[in-house]
C-alpha cells in the first residue's frame, strides 16, 4: 500500500497483520452490527453550510477539557488490551497522545498499569472505570489512578452485562496467555478463563456489578476528588440525571456499538443530550469519528470534543506509536481544513448554523434566509 492518506486505511492493514481473534475483537460490534454501521453512516447524512469570504489565515483549534488546555478537541477513547495490537500497547498510545498535546483515556482493562502508563512521561490522562462487585477493588483502582497523576475518571455506565458480540463467541475470545489485565495483577482478576463462550463475557458476568445505579455515582464522588465523566449516555432523560448526580461531564457513547444493537448512532443522539444538559455540564462524543469533518459536525451539534477509539488501535497494530501519531496528525489536519473551508477560525465560531441534518430537512426543506 502507498502512503496512508486517511485513518480508515489503517483498518485494512490491521486486518492483515493481526490474528483473526484479535482483529475481530477490536473491529466487531453487537449482534447484527446495525449500530456499528450506523455510527459511521449517520455522519454522512449531515451536510455543511459553509460561510465564505472570511479571513481564515489563522486558525486556533485549541480546546479546554475539564479545565485542561489541549491542542485540539480530538482525544483518545479507552480501548482495552492494546498490547494485543502491538507489543508497546498503551505505552505507545500514551506517548503519541502526549506528543499531540491531547488526552488519552486508559482502559481499566489495559495490558499496561496506570503506573506504567504514567511512567511514559508527562501528559493529561483520564482513567476509564468499570465498577466491580468488590468495591475495595474499585477504591484501590481509583486511588492508584490519582497517585499516578490521572486527571479524571470516565465511568462506563452501559455495561451491566457484556453485549452479545458474536465474533468473540465464535472465536472463543480470550486474552492471549502472554498478557494480563495489568491493573488487576495480585487481585485474582487479571486473567480470563477459556470458556465455551467469549472469555470476556464470562469475566464481566463474574466481576462487574449489575446493581450499579445513580447512587453509585455519588458514592464514587465520595471516594475521589477527581471529576467524573459519565460515559454511555444517549438519552435526554439520562443526561438530566447525570447533571443531577453531580457528574463533571457526559460522554455520548454506545460503547462503539458493542453493547445494545439498534440504538441510534451517537451523532444522532448527541443533540438530544446536549439540549437536556442545557450548558450545565460539557457533553463529549465517541463512536464512528473517522474524519475531521466528523469532528466539526459533532462540535456544531454541541459537543465540546470527541474521542476516537478503533482508529488508534488499528494504527497501533499497523505502525505502533508512529501510527497513532499519524492518526492524530491526520485528524488534526482534516479538522483544521474543515474549519477553514467552513469559515471558522476558532471552536467558538462553529455553530449549529454550519450544518444541515435530517431533522432540519423534515422541519423545513430549505434554510431560511
Swiss-Prot record:
E.C. designation(s): 1.1.3.15
Site (Involved in determining the substrate specificity of glycolate oxidase): 109
Residue ranges of coiled coil: none
InterPro entries reported for this sequence: Aldolase_TIM, Alpha-hydoxy_acid_DH_FMN, FMN-dep_DH, FMN_HAD, FMN_hydac_DH_AS
Tissue and organ expression note: Expressed constitutively in leaves (at protein level).
Active site positions: 255 (proton acceptor)
Top-rank taxon: Eukaryota
UniProt motif (Microbody targeting signal) ranges: 367-369
Binding-site residues, FMN: 78-80, 107, 128-130, 156, 231, 253, 286-290, 309-310
Cofactor names: FMN
Regulation acting on activity, per entry: Competitively inhibited by oxalate.
Cellular compartments per GO CC: peroxisome
Associated pathway: Photosynthesis; photorespiration; glycine from 2-phosphoglycolate: step 2/3
GO function term, MF aspect, one: (S)-2-hydroxy-acid oxidase activity
Catalytic activity: glycolate + O2 = glyoxylate + H2O2
Cited function: Catalyzes the oxidation of glycolate to glyoxylate, with a reduction of O2 to H2O2. Is a key enzyme in photorespiration in plants. To a lesser extent, is also able to oxidize glyoxylate to oxalate in vitro. Can exert a strong regulation over photosynthesis, possibly through a feed-back inhibition on Rubisco activase. Does not seem to play a role in oxalate accumulation.
Family stated for the protein in its record: Belongs to the FMN-dependent alpha-hydroxy acid dehydrogenase family.
Assembly information from the UniProt record: Homotetramer. Interacts with rice dwarf virus (RDV) P8. This interaction promotes viral P8 relocation to virus factories peripheral to peroxisomes. Binds to CATB and CATC; these interactions are disturbed by alpha-hydroxy-2-pyridinemethanesulfonic acid (HPMS) and salicylic acid (SA).
Name of the protein in question: Glycolate oxidase 1
Gene source species: Oryza sativa subsp. japonica (Rice)
Gene behind this protein: GLO1
Amino acid at each position: 500500500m502507498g502512503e496512508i492518506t486517511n485513518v480508515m486505511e489503517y483498518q485494512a492493514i490491521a486486518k492483515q497483520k493481526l490474528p483473526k481473534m484479535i482483529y475481530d475483537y477490536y473491529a466487531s460490534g453487537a449482534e447484527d452490527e446495525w449500530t456499528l454501521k450506523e455510527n459511521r453512516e449517520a455522519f454522512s447524512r449531515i451536510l455543511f453550510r459553509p460561510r465564505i469570504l472570511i479571513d481564515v489565515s489563522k486558525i486556533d483549534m485549541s480546546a479546554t477539557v475539564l479545565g485542561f488546555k489541549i491542542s485540539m478537541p480530538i482525544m483518545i477513547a479507552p480501548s482495552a488490551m492494546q498490547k494485543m495490537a502491538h507489543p508497546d500497547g498503551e505505552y505507545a498510545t500514551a506517548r503519541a497522545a502526549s506528543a499531540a498535546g491531547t488526552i488519552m483515556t486508559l482502559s481499566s482493562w489495559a495490558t499496561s498499569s496506570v503506573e506504567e502508563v504514567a511512567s511514559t512521561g508527562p501528559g493529561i490522562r483520564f482513567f476509564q472505570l468499570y465498577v466491580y462487585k468488590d468495591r475495595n477493588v474499585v477504591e484501590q483502582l481509583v486511588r492508584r489512578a490519582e497517585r499516578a497523576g490521572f486527571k479524571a475518571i470516565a465511568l462506563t455506565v452501559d455495561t451491566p452485562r457484556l453485549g452479545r458480540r458474536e465474533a468473540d463467541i465464535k472465536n472463543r475470545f480470550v486474552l492471549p496467555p502472554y498478557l494480563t489485565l495489568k491493573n488487576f495483577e495480585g487481585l485474582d482478576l487479571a486473567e480470563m478463563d477459556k470458556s465455551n463462550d467469549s472469555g470476556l463475557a464470562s469475566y464481566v458476568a463474574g466481576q462487574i456489578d449489575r446493581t450499579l445505579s445513580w447512587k453509585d455515582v455519588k458514592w464514587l464522588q465520595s471516594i475521589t476528588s477527581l471529576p467524573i465523566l459519565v460515559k454511555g449516555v444517549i438519552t435526554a432523560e439520562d443526561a438530566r440525571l447525570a447533571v443531577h448526580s453531580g457528574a463533571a461531564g457526559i460522554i455520548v457513547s454506545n460503547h462503539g456499538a458493542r453493547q445494545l444493537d439498534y440504538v441510534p448512532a451517537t451523532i444522532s443522539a448527541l443533540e438530544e443530550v446536549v439540549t437536556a444538559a442545557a450548558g450545565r455540564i460539557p457533553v463529549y462524543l465517541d463512536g464512528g469519528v473517522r474524519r475531521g469533518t466528523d469532528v466539526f459536525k459533532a462540535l456544531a451539534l454541541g459537543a465540546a470534543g470527541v474521542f476516537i477509539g478503533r482508529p488508534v488501535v488499528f494504527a497501533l497494530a499497523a505502525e505502533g506509536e508512529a501510527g497513532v501519531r499519524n492518526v492524530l496528525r491526520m485528524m488534526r489536519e482534516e479538522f483544521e481544513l474543515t474549519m477553514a473551508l467552513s469559515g471558522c477560525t476558532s471552536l467558538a465560531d462553529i455553530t449549529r448554523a454550519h450544518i444541515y441534518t435530517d431533522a432540519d430537512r423534515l422541519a423545513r426543506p430549505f434554510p431560511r434566509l
